[in-house]
Design a protein with these regions (language model features):
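Intrinsically disordered, low-complexity terminal regulatory regions
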Residues: 1-52
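A short, aliphatic-rich beta-strand micro-motif
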Residues: 110-119
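Short glycine-/small-residue motifs
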Residues: 114, 124-127
Length: 165
């Protein structure tokens, strides 16, 4: 079952990197991903979180993809992965007040790692993320961004397989 495999991958990733939450954001057009059309919406399709963390997947459904524009740009400009520390959130607020409000006020997020999920035609089809309260507990020297990108590649393959069934 694809959902079980995805949850297992997210659980392992979340625990390995000591994150409070790990999730997969999928881009879509209404009810399905239509080939060769620009994506308009996104959902938090899969989510795994630590025991004391409240799920947010119910708050992240059918949102306009334009909200994630800065994240998508940063992912593309940074070889498929981007880290936002709480100290950089002010810069994000200047670039995209809507995204800042969504992350900070609606979801209460302060530190994130986003990695791009790519389809077989190398288009961005989604994002996998790790969420942290405090990066200082987990310095970047133990967070292997290359490994996160490798794991994202496995998640991409699972999403591609799901879209074919």
């Amino acid at each position: 079952d694809i959902s079980e495999k995805m949850q297992k991958m997210l659980f392992e990733m979340m625990n390995f990197y000591h994150a409070r939450r790990c999730g997969v954001i999928e881009f879509h057009n209404s009810t399905s991903n239509l080939n060769n059309l620009s994506f308009l919406w996104y959902d938090l399709s899969y989510e795994n979180m630590q025991r004391n963390v409240t799920p947010i997947s119910g708050k992240v459904k059918n949102l306009q993809l334009s909200i994630l524009s800065p994240v998508m740009t940063d992912i593309i400009d940074n070889d498929g992965i981007v880290v936002y520390r709480s100290s950089e959130m002010k810069t994000l607020e200047q670039r995209s007040p809507v995204l800042y409000d969504h992350l900070k006020n609606k979801l209460n997020v302060s530190n994130m790692i986003y990695a791009g999920l790519y389809g077989c035609n190398n288009n961005l089809i989604g994002i996998v993320f790790l969420e942290y309260n405090d990066f200082f507990k987990y310095p970047e020297d133990i967070i292997d961004l290359h490994d996160i990108k490798e794991r994202a590649s496995g998640i991409s393959q699972l999403l591609e397989f799901k879209s074919m069934i």
